[in-house]
Design a protein with these regions (language model features):
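Structural detector for short beta-strands of small beta-barrel domains
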Residues: 2-49
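Short nucleic-acid-contacting surface segments enriched for D/E, G, S/T with interspersed K/R
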Residues: 67-87
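Beta-strand secondary-structure signal
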Residues: 34, 51-53, 83-85
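OB-fold (S1/OB) nucleic-acid-binding surfaces
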Residues: 41-67
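OB-fold/S1-family single-stranded nucleic acid-binding modules
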Residues: 89-103
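Intrinsic disorder/low-complexity segments enriched in polar/small residues
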Residues: 5, 35, 41, 80-83, ...
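Generic low-polarity alpha-helical segments
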Residues: 1, 18, 26, 54-56, ...
Length: 103
């Protein structure tokens, strides 16, 4: 993922998180996990996006779905036990990419 693409993906998050995320992007501090996530909707919407979080062993990671329909689709897939590959920024814990793992 290019730095420019990563910077576009952090828009809409709180400014404090964006500031930390910019450092993560410059340092290429990306992490990837493969899990069956438990999605939790967070407070607030931003121009029809849905903010959500996923609990990992070491805390929460935060993401945005483009619409409520996208969020429900991901949530339903996870409920069925589908494994997702998630790339997120190490310190800011913002999800850059999330996709269902295809075996």
């Amino acid at each position: 993922m290019t730095r420019e693409t990563a910077k576009r993906k952090i828009k809409g998050f709180p400014f404090a998180m964006q500031s930390i995320a910019k450092e993560d992007i410059e340092n290429r501090a990306y992490k990837t996990v493969e899990i069956v996530p438990l999605f939790e909707m967070e407070d607030g919407y931003y121009q029809m996006t849905v903010n959500y979080r996923i609990k990992l062993d070491d805390g929460y990671i935060h993401g945005k779905a483009l619409s409520i329909e996208d969020f429900i689709k991901m949530h339903d897939e996870a409920e069925r036990g589908e494994v997702f590959t998630i790339m997120y920024l190490e310190k800011s814990r913002i999800i850059l990419e999330i996709e269902e793992k295809n075996d």
